[in-house]
Swiss-Prot record:
The UniProt record lists the keyword Disulfide bond: no
Pfam families: UFC1
Function per UniProt: E2-like enzyme which forms an intermediate with UFM1 via a thioester linkage.
An annotated GO BP: response to endoplasmic reticulum stress
Catalytic residues as annotated in Swiss-Prot or TrEMBL: 116 (glycyl thioester intermediate)
Keyword check for DNA-binding: no
Identification of the protein by name: Ubiquitin-fold modifier-conjugating enzyme 1
Amino acid sequence: MVDAATKKTLSNIPLLKTKAGPRDRDLWVQRLKEEYQALIQYVENNKKEDNDWFRLESNKEGTRWFGKCWHYQDLMKYEFEIEFDIPITFPTTAPEIAIPELEGKTAKMYRGGKICLTDHFKPLWGRNVPKFGIAHAMALGLGPWLAVEIPDLISKGLVQHKDDQQQQK
């Protein structure tokens, strides 16, 4: 089930109304507007809560997204490139968020660095089509994944802070 903090986060992200994917042309433009509004609201909420942890941008068509996410541990910032494509069957199918530089470092990842979200996130997404969008995928998918996986990867020495990497060279 969803904990109280997650419920609070979700309640502050606008729900989307337009059920449209990249093939739906005019409706897709409307959906993209809703996506951007939800993302802007989510980022603003995070900044107010001193919990700013990602930046995203897209190509002109809104079908390819890329940016950075970060995780703080022991007062050190670990930053990662993220990317994903909007599936043709979106919003029925959730985007598969990838962190390519972490590929092969954890079992909770698929080929290409796509993070594993099947057990918890995908059923929740399926029950909330078309209300959930990219901001929800970040809040319910990537955010919790980073919170669990990155500390584990750091403790195993599989992820190092960029300052530590430079000192070793």
